[in-house]
């Protein structure tokens, strides 16, 4: 596995896993819930493998660390975008118990986990708007550019299409 793939496994697969676990937690649609159990197992393996690789790279050469940092720079924003824009107040997937958490809550929890991890191993987060709220004790990410995702926006999809995505 190359260094770039390690960053993808560490960041993107972890975001996918968090999103899928939120669906699995309360999903009322049996066939989807059953297949998610297998998918979550697989995504968990990928995320743990990426984390293990990140730990090794953190102790590696300067060149390896620079390559991993470049991959973090490339994949940070797509990882945040994976959660989707903030959920609508009338989110049908929440109302029908297809998922358990709002997109912004999942994204917030993911940031709380991964910013400290990256910092602890000497990597930087490529978010110029990232701040730490010392009163609340949590990280606040900067604004997300949704422009690259507009062609596949959920506002243009029907419910059956969303379930297949």
Report residues per predicted region.
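Conserved small/polar residues in nucleotide/adenosyl-binding loops
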Residues: 1-5, 155-161
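Amphipathic, non-membrane alpha-helical segments in soluble helical-bundle scaffolds
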Residues: 3-13, 33, 65, 69, ...
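Alpha-helical bundle segments that constitute or directly flank the non-heme di-iron/ferroxidase center
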Residues: 3-26, 80-84
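Alpha-helical transition-metal enzyme core signature, strongest for iron centers
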Residues: 9-17, 36-50, 75-79
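Inter-helical turn/loop segments and adjacent helix faces that build the functional surface
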Residues: 20-38, 52-67, 90, 94
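Hydrophobic/aromatic-lined pockets within catalytic cores
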Residues: 24-28, 44, 48-62, 76, ...
